[in-house]
């Protein structure tokens, strides 16, 4: 597993020519399925500021390798604000405070979110992720999606 906090700031390079495309700024996630759908980038000179997860060849200790130098723009109107995960308020579906999101552990090959780390030291399974909004990350309670 890799941690988002260790991935942010890593250079993103093209597999074609090893040229730096940008640096990792964050993740775009799909709560349904707890999957990373894209990487948000900083420092991109040409093109968009997001690369689709399917174009990520490897997430290593020193860099992220992507298969294309042209990055796809994240066109959703609710994009970047909703995807700044670290430090975002963490709430249960009942509205109870669960601290803030301190980190996200994910599988660097599949993009599956394994664990959400709360500022209170709780480890919340990724399958409990219900939503990511501008205000908070929401996790399920009860049954398989409980805290």
Regions found by a protein language model. Give the residues of each.
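Peripheral interaction segments used for macromolecular assembly
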Residues: 1-147
């Amino acid at each position: 597993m890799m941690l988002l906090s260790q991935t942010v700031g890593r250079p993103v390079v093209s597999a074609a020519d090893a040229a730096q495309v940008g640096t990792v700024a964050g993740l775009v996630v799909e709560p349904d399925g707890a999957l990373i759908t894209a990487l948000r980038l900083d420092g991109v000179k040409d093109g968009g500021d997001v690369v689709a997860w399917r174009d990520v060849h490897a997430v290593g200790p020193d860099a992220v390798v992507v298969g294309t130098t042209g990055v796809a723009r994240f066109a959703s109107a609710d994009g970047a604000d909703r995807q700044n995960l670290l430090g975002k308020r963490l709430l249960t579906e009942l509205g109870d405070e669960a601290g803030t999101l301190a980190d996200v552990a994910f599988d660097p090959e599949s993009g599956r979110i394994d664990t959400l780390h709360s500022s209170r030291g709780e480890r919340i399974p990724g399958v409990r992720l219900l939503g990511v909004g501008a205000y908070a990350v929401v996790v399920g309670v009860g049954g398989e999606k409980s805290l």
